[in-house]
């Protein structure tokens, strides 16, 4: 089991962070659309379900820092064959995805005036923090006024930007796998051929 990345493959840690982030991101969407489609999102009955969305969103945010740190200090697999323009576009797309993984949880948290309960601990709502107290005192803003533009940004990112960036990421991986027939997708899969679990 290779924990660190190599020139040919992502290590266990990078793959764990990638797929955990992806699972939490997708699950957060499933939960919030369940609330939108099947519940009244303004009723107290929806809050425990929304709390799951908040937990998953913050989990995505918490995972960004170790992902970025590991990307910066660790070896990155070699670029697949392609033009310099393709490599620059791929690099830009990856950083756009990281930006999204920061912006979505951040705006979600800033616009949530309720604590997020993780079970063993809870994260205080932003409206109860010292930074918001400073913002409120300095600019005379109530939390209700503060959260309106923050929520608008969060919803815009969620409805229009997130799926576009994620779809581009997935389509690019499938393009490399099925059209280019290189190892861009397989080197991030949970197991390589040599790591397949045996009976």
Residue ranges and their predicted role:
Residues 1-199:
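Membrane-embedded alpha-helical bundles that constitute the cytochrome b-like, heme-associated redox core
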């Amino acid at each position: 089991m290779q924990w660190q990345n190599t020139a040919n493959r992502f290590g266990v840690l990078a793959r764990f962070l990638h797929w955990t982030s992806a699972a939490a991101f997708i699950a957060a969407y499933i939960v919030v659309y369940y609330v939108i489609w099947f519940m009244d999102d303004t009723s107290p009955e929806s809050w425990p379900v929304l709390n799951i969305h908040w937990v998953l969103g913050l989990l995505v945010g918490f995972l960004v820092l170790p992902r970025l740190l590991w990307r910066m200090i660790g070896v990155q697999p070699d670029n697949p064959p392609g033009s310099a323009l393709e490599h620059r576009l791929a690099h830009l797309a990856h950083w756009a995805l990281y930006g999204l993984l920061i912006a979505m949880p951040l705006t979600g948290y800033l616009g949530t005036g309720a604590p997020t309960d993780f079970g063993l601990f809870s994260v205080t709502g932003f409206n109860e923090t010292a930074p918001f107290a400073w913002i409120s005192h300095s600019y005379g803003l109530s939390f209700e006024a503060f959260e309106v533009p923050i929520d608008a940004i969060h919803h815009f990112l969620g409805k229009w930007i997130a799926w576009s960036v994620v779809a581009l990421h997935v389509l690019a991986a499938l393009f490399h796998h099925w059209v280019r027939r290189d190892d861009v997708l397989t080197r991030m899969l949970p197991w390589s051929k040599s790591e397949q679990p045996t009976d």
